[in-house]
């Protein structure tokens, strides 16, 4: 999609920051209007992160107007609010390609643009990186400004406070803009959210205005003692050493620009608190920012199937109905993980701990020690953030905690920061853990039940984003730990499948007349099955939707080497690279994990 110059005359002129700075201040409200309208037009067609970007239009315009980007560093925390930033930095005519194969990245990416100072996708990293950049600029004697824009719940994560704790002590020249829209993907939770609500309250805002009117403006900004006492209101940020300013209207472009200009050359760490409306300018998104956080397409070919997240949510409700010891935990992913119904039906058994994966896992440890049965729902890519807690606080103590690992494997359009392809490799080495890989939605249901009933340590069920294959959900039964299923009997070739590629593998097995086994468990492996198959076949193929290095195939390799089984093995999975964006089907095709690709990989390997 190209710019419609008649519809967006000012935006078409300001599609670079150099041109943006040529505009008069009086023209900026119209620019903000056109930028918001363009976002509405483009994202409604191309799909993608929607509401967050609408809420930061004025902030984005003001930052590029006041600061000398790209020399000055803008760091967008998490990054799903950066669509306006991309448009204003020369990528507007490509914005319809965002999240698509070979298109613009879903989030800021250093490889894509010099204006993207930090590649992001996960939350709460901006202040730490920004502090490092600020220190580097000071050491080099360069008058480079560093600004971190953080919001959408990212301030609740421990890493953000670790960085503020450091920045408040050393007083490096750093500006943190708190984009306070009262939301992550879901509603913000926790004591910090309550504290921000107090800061936003009418009473404190009125007090703030009265004090400002009583002070000479020049004196207000020159005398640090007056500044701190007049506007801090004992905010947590001022108590941590930041020079707190706000809260101010994050949609008043004139006010934002004036404030930025006044503090631009000030020394020390500032936190500017701006109150915004997620979904600003589009009433449905303003009224329901959770629904409109992302616009996505549903594949009509699987419209009659349940999503794996729905399977999990339904199972959770069934268990909670008869087991009051179940405690379900999510780190700010209630909607995406299929837990909305559960949270309403069983509020006393549900905890949203906000964006705090490390806390979520050790919180579950405390519950397990106390006799409860925690279920932690977590995305594969975010599980990485709680790795030490899993080892030190759960596995080492042999605590029975079930981890429902959503978005495992190829996730698709969110790209390399969100692909859930490392979990098998980083989980498999943990002693005592049980790892299950369902091949369909009913298997997922049975494995969740099996993991929940397992009482000898942690268990993991990893399942993909998207919809199942239409399998009927059967009554819950425990699966024997470490036991696989033969799905097809063939000759000479045995395909050991781990997870959701089973259907694709079946098509390949038919063409090759191969034996196909649904291994079900990555740990413990069904060693008796492998030994049996090794005596009946000449070739082994392992198949998984995850990285080959250290994954399920590596587990098979280790076993056959130790047992002196002299069979050639082909490991099929994802290579040693970060997986780019595209639909799940596109990525599987690129890496030859669709049925034809699997067949060809095996066929050509056998011919060598």
Curated annotation (Swiss-Prot):
Catalyzes the acyloin condensation reaction between C atoms 2 and 3 of pyruvate and glyceraldehyde 3-phosphate to yield 1-deoxy-D-xylulose-5-phosphate (DXP). The keyword Metal-binding applies. Thiamine diphosphate binds at residues 80, 121-123, 153-154, 181, 282, 357. Homodimer. GO terms for biological process: 1-deoxy-D-xylulose 5-phosphate biosynthetic process; isopentenyl diphosphate biosynthetic process, methylerythritol 4-phosphate pathway; terpenoid biosynthetic process; thiamine biosynthetic process. Its cofactor is Mg(2+); thiamine diphosphate. This is 1-deoxy-D-xylulose-5-phosphate synthase. The keyword Magnesium applies. It is an enzyme of class 2 (transferase).
